[in-house]
A protein has these predicted regions:
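Short, intrinsically disordered, charge-balanced linker/junction segments flanking boundaries
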Residues: 1, 199-204
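Rossmann-like NAD(P) dinucleotide-binding subdomain of oxidoreductase/dehydrogenase enzymes
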Residues: 1-103
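ALDH superfamily catalytic-core signature
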Residues: 34, 67-201
Length: 204
């Protein structure tokens, strides 16, 4: 959004219904400093958003579920509108035996923990040889300790629904680091699990 505004474009912003307070903050701030006719914040529901997508945009950037992403994609096709669809997925990281494990672990943990892991392009799982696993986990735990100072309550999840969904994914897994949760604060400590079966829900 910042890049689009800086380049001189008008921008229509549709906040997520999961982050209502942030959406209102964004709406209030934009109205205070920018022309709301050029930078409107749209609060419509799913059906109203579909109507909005009937307009001819120069570019559409969407972050959200794959289900509604299909709707965005179909609407963009009507005008051959360029799109970026950021809809999650499994993002593997492969560690070669020649890699600097400390550097790799630090970068992977930073990418995974940014915004409490709630970004669609975050690293999702690590592929490495068994001989590298122990040292990787050691460096990953050290990185998490530097980032969070062992505070399990520094990673809030956006909604109670997603808190329950994510904590449910940990059931039956071997936890190598982290694992503490706080339902009241919707916090999940950054957690590393190992030797996950390929058919486990966390890998789907």
């Amino acid at each position: 959004v910042v890049g689009a505004i800086a380049a001189g474009n008008c921008v229509v912003i549709k906040p997520s219904h999961n982050s209502h307070n942030f959406g209102h903050l964004l709406d209030t701030t934009l109205r205070k400093y920018l022309d709301p006719e050029c930078f409107p914040v749209f609060w419509g529901n799913a059906d109203e958003t579909k109507e909005l997508l009937e307009e001819k945009f120069d570019y559409i950037y969407y972050t959200g579920s794959a289900n509604f992403g299909k709707t965005v994609h179909l609407a963009a096709n009507k005008y051959l509108t360029p799109t970026t669809l950021e809809m999650g997925g499994k993002n593997p990281v492969y560690i070669d035996p020649s890699a600097d494990l400390e550097l790799a672990a630090t970068r992977i943990m930073w990418g995974k923990c940014f915004n409490s892991g709630q970004t669609c392009i975050a690293p999702d799982y690590v592929l490495c040889t068994k001989s590298l696993q122990k040292n990787f986990i050691k460096h990953a735990k050290a990185a998490l300790s530097r980032f969070y100072k062992n505070d399990p309550n520094s990673c809030p999840i956006v909604t109670h629904y997603h808190f329950k969904r994510v904590t449910g994914l940990l059931h039956g897994l071997t936890v190598a680091a982290g694992g503490r949760t706080d339902p009241l604060l919707k916090c999940i400590e950054p957690t590393i699990v190992v030797d996950v079966p390929s058919n486990h829900p966390i890998l789907q």
